[in-house]
Regions:
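ATP-binding N-terminal substructure of ATP-dependent carboxylate-amine bond-forming enzymes
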Residues: 1-81, 86-90, 94, 117-120
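Active-site nucleotide/adenylate-binding loops and adjacent lid/helix of ATP-dependent enzymes
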Residues: 2-9, 15, 71-76, 85-184, ...
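Short, solvent-exposed loop/turn segments at secondary-structure junctions
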Residues: 12, 59, 141-142, 179-180, ...
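Short, solvent-exposed loop/turn elements at beta->coil junctions and helix N-caps
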Residues: 40-42, 175-180, 280-283
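Structured loop/turn residues at beta-strand edges in well-structured enzyme cores
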Residues: 47, 104, 129-130, 275, ...
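A short beta-strand motif that forms the metal-chelation/ATP-contact edge
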Residues: 49-54, 187-191, 288-301
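Phosphate-binding site of ATP-dependent enzymes
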Residues: 151-266, 270, 291
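ATP-dependent carboxylate activation and anion-phosphoryl transfer catalytic cores
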Residues: 255-327
Length: 327
């Protein structure tokens, strides 16, 4: 019997996910039936799939409660990857505090919650900021929407942005802008479930057969700087006025040993199991040491086009997982 796989997207992302076609082709070549389904389509019978794979559900941050309710419901009807517990944990960037407490080198992160005094919170952060620029972003967000960088002297513009987010009921994440990214870019390391890779030492990620027990490193890419130059005092925060995602400049990259080590520590600190895929986004600090910027476990782009065979490798992991649940 052919496994039936859903690649889960969003209506707004149709035609935008460059990973979708190669992954669907790889799954079909490996003997699966594949359907592309919008997560919020009421006409989809999720119980008809052996596995639903989250891919380009890029509008979730605007509808988080609705999306998480859907995740819970669908996880009772079929195998959802990544699992519901992982998605709940990963869709709010407060997880960065948990990883930092676990000893993972992480970009310094300060959160302001709705109801907080925006000016007091921002000024407290600026008083401790050593870098000349900062980044302000929503704690729940995707595609760099509503994310801007500011010079520390552009306090008024940063404060207007922070206030707009807080007034909309959104938690705010403040971080230093690490200028090394302008030259070196980000390093995105992609991991798939599969056979143990002794070069990374990543912990087991799921119960089950050998092919499901471990996340292993597959490939890496360089992501060019995503944020434009710092905004000035007269900038309109434009919260809510943005495209689905910010375009990225992607090129292949060879992951360095120190980057693999930090990625392994980040993955080992995840408090949930059952992952099929993960993307670890790192940048380098002023001392040229890699630090975690984000851990993408929900709907990351996996950049198959920059690593021949990577779609097929994830496809095999998907089918291994699906077949393990087929009676």
């Amino acid at each position: 019997m052919k496994p039936v796989i859903a690649l889960v997207t969003a209506r707004a992302a149709r035609g935008l996910d460059e990973d979708e076609a190669p992954l669907a082709a790889a799954l079909r070549a490996a003997g699966a039936e594949v359907a592309i389904a919008d997560w919020d389509d009421p006409g989809v019978s999720w119980e008809s799939f052996d596995l639903a794979l989250l891919r380009s559900t890029w509008d979730y941050s605007e509808r988080l409660s609705e999306f998480l309710a859907w995740v819970e419901r669908v996880s009772r009807l079929t195998t959802l990857s990544n699992p519901a517990a992982v998605v709940r944990w990963n869709t709010d960037k407060h997880y960065l505090l948990e990883l930092a407490r676990a000893g993972v080198p992480t970009v310094c992160s300060r959160f302001l919650e709705p109801g907080a005094d925006a000016a007091v919170g921002l000024d407290s952060f600026l008083a401790q900021l050593e870098e000349p620029e900062l980044v302000a972003k929503p704690a729940v967000g995707a595609g760099s929407r509503d994310t801007h960088r500011y010079r520390r002297q552009s306090r008024a513009a940063a404060l207007a942005h922070v206030r707009q987010l807080l007034d909309a009921g959104r938690s705010v994440l403040l971080q230093p802008y690490l200028g090394r990214v302008d030259e070196y870019g980000e390093t995105a390391l992609i991991f798939f479930a599969g056979v143990f890779d002794p070069t990374t030492g990543v912990k087991p990620g799921a119960r089950g057969g050998a092919s499901m027990d471990v996340l292993h490193f597959d490939h890496a890419v360089r992501k060019g700087p995503m944020l434009p130059g710092p905004r000035d005092e007269h900038a309109n925060p434009e919260v809510g006025a943005r495209p689905l995602f910010v375009a990225e400049h992607i090129t292949p990259r060879t992951a360095q040993p120190d980057e693999l080590e930090v990625a392994a520590r980040a993955l080992a600190a995840i408090p949930h199991e059952g992952l099929l895929y993960a993307r670890v986004d790192l940048i380098r600090d002023a001392a040229d040491a890699p630090v975690l910027l984000e851990l993408e476990l929900t709907e990351p782009s996996l950049f198959f086009g920059h690593s021949p065979g990577s779609a097929a490798r994830l496809g095999r992991a998907v089918l291994d997982r699906a077949r393990s649940f087929i009676l």
